[in-house]
């Protein structure tokens, strides 16, 4: 009788506080398979559970998404902020799969019993401990959402991103044009408003447990991108909301963005989300797509409808974060997910079973991070050592236990080298995927270009290193290096000038405007002219920051600007027609607003723009001096090493006859006391031979012609002399003969 009462109480709690429409299936006692290796057993675990009488073997691997400094913030009745560190929750999160269903995902917390999700091909289960049980009993229930019947995103925020689709690429584009996905980390700061706090249990640890569970599932989804979603901290508005949460999602977003700028400035995060409970919301969220690293727009609102459970809510957050990192919603006629629901599908929040990102999402993300480097995602992780997750064969990413991964059947370009079903190499081939793998399944030789330079002064070509089928990480000049004859600075691999920025927006011929235009445009208290926002109000630039606020351009033709810019502002100042665009009317794909001067643009002697302020240039991040470290024969790159000029050998740019230059980071370097690389040495000897041949040959031809002409002239002169002397010689001979004859006659 007591057991039945406890079971009914537990089901009532699930129904009331999780929003689940789950169907109770079974009570199970999970059985842990012990390992003799204590270190391995801490990283990997195996549990056996039963669902409806059928045993399932869960292979789990430790999942790290809570940083060491993770805190939970709450407010007391007096409005004072307090923080706690739930340290016990930080080391008990795992993800994996069920051996009986290889195409499955399992995300569990084992802090106090097993709690989490089991996603099979077309069904999802939730598992939670039966807290009143003394026999480690758990309940397993089938997850089932009602259709929330709400729109995905507020229109006036989704359209901002759609005006600039330059980041989109055709689905049949070559993978070799996309850089390899390196491990990246996205820090999300979560705030739970009062209504959702009450809906989830109205108790700090219970709500914290549910939010951590949701982010754990979101992190599992993003492992496809090698992107770890970390919950930097959690804030609970347990007594009262700090801002009004009335109105639609887009209205709340504006208020939240203003509040965030004032109160979260010292708390580390890449993006902050406010989670709001709304029984029947018009939209499930609002955010600024493609703005993950833009401090002016790094926020979002996620609505929790009454009709969904924690799994469905995790999909909503994953979709919103997907928009932040450059994804778009899937076109079901072109995008597919093998035996799974596509996360960026509009129906995903109510679907059951395993969910993955589609081929379209993979292309969107790979292109976004390769062309518009999301620098904030490339920081060092503050996590405990993150153990490798289960590899996903066919996602185009070479992961642990994979010999190759050329994508799915449609994408794979190395079918004779790599088995796209098993991600194993065929036969004795050397490689089966990557830009440094040849069509003959061999590694490209050292020095083969694999990523071309996109800026002649600030970005460098990368080469295959001869040991990997992947291209080395991108190398470029350290931020602050002078370019364009000392009139501009390199920043994130580009020579940043207002002329280049204006030409990209308004077309060929457009240039950066004179100072008078910048001064006028950035000194007014209007929504279209400002140096950022504070409390949702436009912020005029200080005089020192005038050249770092709104971008001002001049152009030769009035209507020369590109058609995708719909909001253009004209000003007539000191005989100049100054042109700018309204804030938010055109977003760069790296998350910054085209309306503003790009970071790294020169704003004075040894000064450049950073986040709309003019700052002193510092070659930050590394102790690299071109004069001492590179001996004046190279420049510093983004890894703090010397990028040597041709004829000088890295790492310290010593003179080396025949060296192509470069750095130890660009892939074309091979340690040797004598030569840079055999290929580079031989190649440059060949180049010198060819160059010498083409230099000497013309001189040889000219010399031969001169000698030939000189001989011709000499012969001609001799013939002329002979012709002049010969008649006189004949007369002299005749005279001598006549004398002789006369002498004889006498």
From Swiss-Prot:
The keyword Ribosomal protein does not apply. It is found in: Membrane. InterPro entries: ADAM_Cys-rich, Disintegrin_CS, Disintegrin_dom, Disintegrin_dom_sf, EGF-like_dom, MetalloPept_cat_dom_sf, Peptidase_M12B, Peptidase_M12B_N. Residues 390-479 form the Disintegrin domain. It is a single-pass type I membrane protein. Residues 177-687 are extracellular. The prodomain and the metalloprotease-like domain are cleaved during the epididymal maturation of the spermatozoa. SMART domains: ACR (SM00608), DISIN (SM00050). The keyword 4Fe-4S does not apply. Its main location: membrane. The lineage of its organism: Eukaryota, Metazoa, Chordata, Craniata, Vertebrata. It comes from the Eukaryota. Residues 709-746 are cytoplasmic. GO terms for biological process: binding of sperm to zona pellucida; cell adhesion; cell differentiation; male gonad development; proteolysis; spermatogenesis. It holds the Pfam family Pep_M12B_propep. Sperm surface membrane protein that may be involved in spermatogenesis and fertilization. This is a non catalytic metalloprotease-like protein. This is Disintegrin and metalloproteinase domain-containing protein 18. SUPFAM superfamilies: Blood coagulation inhibitor (disintegrin) (SSF57552), Metalloproteases ('zincins'), catalytic domain (SSF55486). Expressed predominantly in adult and prepubertal testis. Residues 1-16 form the signal peptide. Disulfide bonds join 293-376, 335-360, 337-342, 450-471, 624-636, 630-642, 644-653. A tripeptide motif (ECD) within disintegrin-like domain could be involved in the binding to egg integrin receptor and thus could mediate sperm/egg binding. GO terms for cellular component: plasma membrane. Glycans are attached at residues 36, 122, 149, 156, 177, 294, 359, 465, 611, 625. Residues 620-654 form the EGF-like domain.
């Amino acid at each position: 009788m007591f057991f039945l009462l406890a079971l009914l109480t537990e089901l009532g709690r699930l129904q009331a506080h999780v929003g689940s429409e789950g169907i109770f299936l079974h009570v199970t006692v999970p059985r842990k398979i012990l390992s003799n290796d204590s270190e391995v057993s801490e990283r990997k675990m195996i549990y056996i559970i039963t669902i409806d009488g059928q045993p399932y073997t869960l292979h789990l691997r430790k999942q790290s998404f809570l940083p060491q400094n993770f805190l939970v913030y709450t407010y007391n009745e007096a409005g004072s902020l307090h923080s706690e560190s739930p340290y016990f929750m930080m080391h008990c999160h795992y993800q994996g799969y069920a051996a009986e269903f290889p195409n499955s995902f399992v995300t569990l917390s084992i802090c106090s019993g097993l709690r989490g999700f089991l996603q099979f091909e077309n069904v999802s289960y939730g598992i939670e401990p039966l807290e009143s049980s003394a026999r480690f009993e758990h309940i397993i229930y089938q997850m089932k959402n009602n259709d929330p019947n709400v729109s995905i995103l507020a229109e006036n925020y989704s359209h901002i991103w759609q005006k600039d689709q330059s980041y989109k690429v055709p689905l049949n584009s070559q993978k070799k044009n996309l850089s390899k996905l390196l491990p990246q980390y996205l820090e999300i700061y979560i705030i739970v408003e009062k209504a959702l706090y009450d809906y989830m249990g109205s108790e700090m640890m219970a709500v914290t447990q549910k939010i951590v569970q949701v982010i754990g599932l979101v992190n599992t989804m993003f492992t496809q991108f090698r992107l770890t979603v970390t919950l930097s901290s959690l804030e609970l508005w347990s007594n009262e909301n700090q801002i009004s949460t009335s109105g639609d999602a887009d209205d709340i977003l504006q208020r939240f963005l203003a509040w965030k700028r004032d109160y979260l400035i010292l708390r580390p995060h890449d993006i902050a989300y406010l989670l709001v409970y709304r029984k029947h919301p018009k939209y499930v969220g609002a955010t600024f797509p493609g703005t993950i690293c833009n401090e002016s727009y790094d926020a979002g609102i996620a609505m929790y409808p009454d009709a969904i459970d924690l799994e469905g809510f995790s999909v909503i957050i994953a979709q919103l974060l997907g928009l932040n990192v450059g994804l778009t919603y899937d076109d079901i006629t072109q995008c597919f997910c093998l035996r799974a629901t596509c996360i960026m599908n509009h129906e995903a929040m109510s679907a059951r079973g395993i969910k993955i990102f589609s081929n379209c999402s993979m292309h969107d993300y790979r292109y976004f991070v390769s062309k518009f480097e999301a620098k904030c995602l490339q920081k060092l992780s503050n996590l405990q050592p993150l153990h490798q997750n289960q590899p996903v064969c066919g996602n185009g990413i070479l992961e642990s236990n994979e010999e190759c991964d050329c994508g799915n059947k449609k994408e794979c370009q190395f079918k004779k080298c790599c088995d796209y079903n098993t991600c194993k190499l065929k036969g004795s081939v050397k490689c089966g995927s990557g830009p440094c793998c040849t069509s003959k399944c061999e590694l490209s030789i050292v020095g083969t270009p694999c990523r071309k330079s996109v800026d002649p002064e600030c970005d460098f070509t990368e080469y295959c290193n001869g040991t990997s089928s992947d291209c080395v990480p991108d190398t470029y000049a350290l931020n602050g290096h002078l370019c364009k004859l000392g009139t501009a600075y390199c920043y994130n691999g580009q020579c940043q000038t207002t002329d280049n920025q204006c030409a990209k927006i308004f077309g060929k011929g457009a240039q950066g405007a004179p100072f008078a235009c910048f001064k006028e445009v950035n000194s007014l208290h209007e929504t279209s002219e400002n140096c950022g926002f504070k409390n949702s109000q436009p912020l005029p630039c200080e005089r020192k920051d005038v050249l770092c606020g709104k971008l001002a351009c001049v152009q030769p033709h009035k209507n020369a600007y590109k058609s995708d810019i719909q909001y253009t502002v004209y000003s007539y100042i000191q005989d100049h027609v100054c042109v700018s665009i309204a804030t938010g009317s055109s977003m760069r794909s790296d998350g910054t607003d085209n309306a503003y001067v790009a970071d790294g643009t020169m704003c004075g002697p040894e000064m450049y723009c950073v986040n709309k302020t003019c700052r002193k240039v510092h070659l930050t991040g590394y102790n690299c001096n071109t004069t001492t470290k590179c001996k004046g024969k190279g420049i510093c790159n983004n890894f703090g090493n010397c990028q040597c000029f041709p004829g000088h050998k890295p790492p310290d740019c010593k003179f080396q006859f025949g060296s192509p230059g470069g750095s130890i980071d660009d892939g074309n370097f091979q340690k040797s006391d004598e030569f840079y690389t055999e290929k580079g040495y031989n190649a440059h000897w060949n180049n010198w031979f060819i160059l010498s041949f083409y230099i000497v040959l013309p001189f040889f031809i000219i010399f031969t012609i001169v000698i030939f002409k000189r001989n011709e002239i000499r012969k001609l002169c001799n013939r002329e002399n002979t012709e002049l002397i010969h008649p006189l010689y004949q007369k002299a001979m005749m005279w001598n003969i006549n004398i002789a004859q006369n002498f004889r006659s006498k």
